């Protein structure tokens, strides 16, 4: 996993409530197993007019001024539904580094974190202000200080300290385990003989 300390980027508002994982990444794309390439299918039914990938010009992610936005502002209950990790893969592959919503589906929240995306919960009034920013206005998310720095001020956010440690140090579950490699080896060496090969 890549280290996440601060991120500065532009925002795109998609303020719908209850955007579920099936909307984020429809089931027909779940047979793919490589984490790369899913960005093309993110919000497929909303982004495209047909199966030939004709852009829906009215959909915000297809509007030129929002190309390259890396911070998604959304409504309540983002990522509800099934536990498909592919939805987080699609968000990451599209280029989103931060999702700011009113709440998250529990499993999707963890899937985002496991894939290096920082999910942040903010009240509606903050999200509404963020949604009013122009497409060229940047905000900075500072994980160490747990602050969102915006043109209208700073907004604090909460994150579990274990997740914060993992993101700041670029560690996934395997990376955490490897930090204890010497202790694991010592334990294995000191096991009773009947537990050893």
Curated annotation (Swiss-Prot):
This is 3-isopropylmalate dehydratase small subunit. Keywords: Amino-acid biosynthesis, Branched-chain amino acid biosynthesis, Leucine biosynthesis, Lyase. One of its GO terms (cellular component) is 3-isopropylmalate dehydratase complex. Pathway: Amino-acid biosynthesis; L-leucine biosynthesis; L-leucine from 3-methyl-2-oxobutanoate: step 2/4. It is an enzyme of class 4 (lyase). Catalyzes the isomerization between 2-isopropylmalate and 3-isopropylmalate, via the formation of 2-isopropylmaleate. Gene3D superfamilies: Aconitase, domain 4 (3.20.19.10). One of its GO terms (molecular function) is 3-isopropylmalate dehydratase activity. The keyword S-adenosyl-L-methionine does not apply. Belongs to the LeuD family. LeuD type 1 subfamily. Its EC number is 4.2.1.33. Coiled coil: none annotated. It catalyses: (2R,3S)-3-isopropylmalate = (2S)-2-isopropylmalate. GO terms for biological process: L-leucine biosynthetic process. Heterodimer of LeuC and LeuD.
């Amino acid at each position: 996993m890549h280290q996440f300390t601060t991120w500065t980027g532009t925002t795109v508002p998609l303020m719908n409530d209850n955007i579920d994982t099936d909307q984020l990444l429809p089931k027909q794309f779940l047979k793919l197993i490589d984490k790369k390439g899913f960005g093309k299918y993110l919000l497929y039914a909303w982004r495209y007019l047909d199966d030939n990938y004709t852009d829906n010009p009215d959909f915000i992610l297809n509007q030129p001024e929002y190309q390259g936005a890396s911070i998604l502002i959304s409504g309540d209950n983002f990522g509800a539904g099934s536990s498909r990790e592919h939805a987080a893969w699609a968000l990451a592959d599209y280029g989103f580094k931060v999702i700011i919503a009113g709440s998250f589906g529990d499993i999707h929240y963890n899937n985002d974190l496991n894939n290096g995306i920082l999910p942040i919960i903010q009240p509606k009034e903050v999200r509404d202000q963020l949604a009013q920013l122009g497409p060229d206005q940047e905000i900075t998310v500072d994980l160490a200080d747990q602050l969102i720095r915006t043109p209208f001020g700073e907004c604090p956010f909460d994150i579990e300290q274990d997740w914060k440690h993992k993101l700041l140090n670029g560690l996934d579950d395997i990376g955490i385990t490897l930090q204890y490699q010497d202790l694991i080896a010592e334990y294995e060496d000191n096991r009773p003989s009947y537990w050893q090969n």
